[in-house]
């Protein structure tokens, strides 16, 4: 009996080692997370799309609606998430640029990110739901929130003044069907 318990424990440890990206979402004993696709648009109805390798927000109509980027999400903890696009192959990250924080897309596979890695913290966002809207604060840059400009077709970025009326930090965030 003791040998079978040891073998079972060893087998579980081995499988966790092999499939760390699938199990990084939750501690032992919980079902592993999977990447899920979400639609995102700001409270002014601007959707995200890619233009010249930059994520922008604008009003897409007619045949252009197919340009809308779905946001790939891997939950890390109840309110912490990794965000990506293109099947999780490009991930949103917060990096310091001078005195400002900058949002950038990095060619990293979202399922390779690990929740306890200090180097992966720049990819982590804190999801806060308030009624029908959601905001995303950078875990690496506290106080900096994912935002869109008031004008259409401008880059998606970060702001440290989420209450100011010059940037939009509230989004509708809906799982894609």
Curated annotation (Swiss-Prot):
Annotated signal sequence is 1-25
* Entries under InterPro entries matching the protein: IL-1_CS (IPR020877), IL-1_fam (IPR000975), IL-1RA/IL-36 (IPR003297), IL1/FGF (IPR008996)
Q: Name one GO cellular component term.
A: extracellular space
Record carries keyword Protein transport:
no
Gene Ontology MF terms? cytokine activity; interleukin-1 receptor antagonist activity; interleukin-1 receptor binding
What cystine pairs are annotated?
91-141
What name appears for this protein in its UniProt entry? Interleukin-1 receptor antagonist protein
Supply the source organism for this entry: Sus scrofa (Pig)
Q: What is the name of the gene encoding this protein?
A: IL1RN
